Amino acid sequence: MAFKDVLLTLASYPEPTPVSVIDDAVSVAAALGAHLAAVSCEVHAEVRASLLGYVILDIPALIAREAAKSRENAKALLAAFEASADKSGVRHETIFEHCATASEAALLVDYARLRDLTIMAVPDSHDLGYAEEVIFESGRPTLILPTGPRSRPLRLDAICVAWDFSRTAARAVSDALPLLESARSVRVVTVTNEKPLDSRHSGRELAKNLARHGIEVVLDEIDAERKPIDEVLTSYVLSHGIDVLVMGAYGTPRWREFVLGGATRGLLSKPPVPILFSH
């Protein structure tokens, strides 16, 4: 199934999503020929204090100031989104919501469940739980965009699949098929000597499966050499000019960990390239 209905989440608090993320998301939607909806929330901070502290610190005024800051950021982000989408000719809509800080992630999950793909970034000021909630609870793939400066424009030409024969890796491949089918090159990489792998032949079998979709792949195995897995994958995608990394995620509400072991927080907090996560 092609990605035809895409969601972009724009954080307004405590710091706004960088405008560069908007342009990247619009570029993705344009490449996919998809409709793009941008959602941003006016966030109301929840402050706990004693009755005395509530009076001395004037908590209601503090909450009102922070809500106004969030509202201004959200409005500015949505206006920038509309300008970028109009310029690129991308069909779009804007969604302005109100929510408490504790319920923002759940609200985004509700919208993400009704879209083919969600695009989001994780600003430095945000806890990773902001993205984890969408990745784990939406039931849809999530494309995490880097927020730092990039040396070249975002493209979807060269894609790498991080493959370990797990259920979630298989789900990620399935969810990423629209991207894989339109890519100019696809690499499937397995990291060895990092954890036991269920099948040494699975890479070749996956290549056969993708070939039946008209996707020719290059198979690679790289030795972890006792390095953190996020460093291994980061080095690989940067040295091979990868545009998008595809990988699976698994977890429970109490304890979450991405496949490929320690790749989790390192890649989510500092993605070297856009990463398509699927659970």
Describe every region a protein language model picked out.
Residues 37-39, 95, 119, 143, ...:
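Hydrophobic/aromatic beta-strand patches that form the interior of the parallel beta-sheet core
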Residues 8, 12-13, 99-100, 125, ...:
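A short, flexible beta-alpha/helix-coil linker loop
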Residues 18-21, 104, 127-128, 169-172, ...:
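Amphipathic coiled-coil/heptad-repeat helices and related helical stalk/stem segments
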Residues 22, 27, 31, 106-152, ...:
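Gly/Ser-rich helix-loop-strand patches that form or flank binding pockets
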Residues 60-76:
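A short acidic, glycine-rich active-site loop
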Residues 98-102, 123-126, 166-167:
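Short beta->alpha connector loops
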Residues 1, 43-44, 82-118, 212-245, ...:
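Structural beta-alpha unit
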Residues 1-63, 137, 147, 155-222, ...:
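Small/aliphatic-rich secondary-structure junction motif
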